[in-house]
Amino acid sequence: MKLVFATHNPNKFREIKSLVPKHIELLSLSDINCNEDIEETGDTIDENAMIKADYVRNHYGYDCFADDTGLEVHSLAGAPGVYSARYAGDEKNDEANIEKLLEQLKKRDDRTARFKTVIALNLKGNQNLFTGICEGEILEEKTGTKGFGYDPIFLPNGFESSFAEMELTEKSKISHRGIAFRELMEYLSK
């Protein structure tokens, strides 16, 4: 089975590719010559994932899945949420996003947060959603050099290491994206 993962983010692609069973040939957007930036115009994480999956299916004809992820901080009423990637501006700068979030949390005691990933699968024109959530808290400063996005400041519940301190295999077992992806794989194996 050929399946396109609708992302231009090489870190996301690498993270998911490591989890794909051998009977699925995972293709990237560049593999199908999709070089355009698919605009995320949805008001929710679910909508953004669906927009990307629908775009690839409708324009390229491939079965496809797409994800969108948001970091939801309790004391910020769920922000940055759907705007996580461009929290500090449209440039999608991880460092600037982290700095802005840490600044906003400086005088707050409640640092609880969760990552939420929604994967939209468009298979033969039918769409299904798979959700993964990882609860944790925002650290006061960055730790670790692995991962991407908010990984250096996210400490998952029950762990002493940030996502950026974990090996990819360890992170994938507990991460929001790993949880959603395992749901997707379970669905595809039926």
Curated annotation (Swiss-Prot):
Catalytic reaction equation(s): XTP + H2O = XMP + diphosphate + H(+); dITP + H2O = dIMP + diphosphate + H(+); ITP + H2O = IMP + diphosphate + H(+)
InterPro entries tied to this protein: dITP/XTP_pyrophosphatase (IPR020922), ITPase-like_fam (IPR029001), RdgB/HAM1 (IPR002637)
Documented EC number(s): 3.6.1.66
Enzyme class: hydrolase
Cofactor note: Binds 1 Mg(2+) ion per subunit.
Subunit structure: Homodimer.
Gene Ontology annotations for the cellular component aspect, listed alphabetically: cytosol
GO molecular function: dITP diphosphatase activity; ITP diphosphatase activity; metal ion binding; nucleotide binding; ribonucleoside triphosphate phosphatase activity; XTP diphosphatase activity
Purpose: Pyrophosphatase that catalyzes the hydrolysis of nucleoside triphosphates to their monophosphate derivatives, with a high preference for the non-canonical purine nucleotides XTP (xanthosine triphosphate), dITP (deoxyinosine triphosphate) and ITP. Seems to function as a house-cleaning enzyme that removes non-canonical purine nucleotides from the nucleotide pool, thus preventing their incorporation into DNA/RNA and avoiding chromosomal lesions.
Residues holding substrate: 7-12, 69, 148-151, 171, 176-177
Alphabetical GO biological process terms: nucleotide metabolic process; purine nucleoside triphosphate catabolic process
Binding site for Mg(2+): 39, 68
Protein name listed in UniProt: dITP/XTP pyrophosphatase
Annotated CDD domains: HAM1
Keyword Oxidoreductase: no
Native source organism of the sequence: Christiangramia forsetii (strain DSM 17595 / CGMCC 1.15422 / KT0803)
Keywords: Hydrolase, Magnesium, Metal-binding, Nucleotide metabolism, Nucleotide-binding
Cofactor: Mg(2+)
Similarity remark: Belongs to the HAM1 NTPase family.
Catalytic residues (UniProt): 68 (proton acceptor)
